[in-house]
Amino acid sequence: MTVPQQGQCLDVVVVGGGPAGLTASTYLRRFHRSCRVLDAGHSRARWIPESNNCPGFPDGVAGEVLLQRMRRQAESFGTGFDAVRVECIERQDGRFVLSA
């Protein structure tokens, strides 16, 4: 995969830094895949005052706190982040090229 503004070729680019994207990026890095998360910063999880269906939080957790902790964990494995909105994904020469 190619991130045009950086010219980087990566195993995976995760579009979206919500709980699913952060979980994916953590596992990808744990399995030694090169990975970046591109996130516009509009995760719906931020709106959740208290989520009671997240493993490890039996008393619930605020969405913002959950995102902060998940991002810290992803960063601890070397996940890179870019605060951008992905506008287009195209396949070119056997690769995916993202425009942000």
Feature map (PLM): residue ranges:
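A conserved short coil-to-beta-strand element within the FAD-binding core of flavoproteins
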Residues: D82-F96
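A generic structural signal for short beta-strands and their flanking turns/coil linkers
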Residues: E50, F77, G94-F96
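Conserved beta-strand segments of alpha/beta enzyme cores
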Residues: S34, G80-D82
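Low-complexity, compositionally biased segments
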Residues: V14, F96-V97
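Beta1-alpha1 glycine-rich phosphate/pyrophosphate-binding loop at the start
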Residues: V3-Q5, L10-Q68, R72-E75
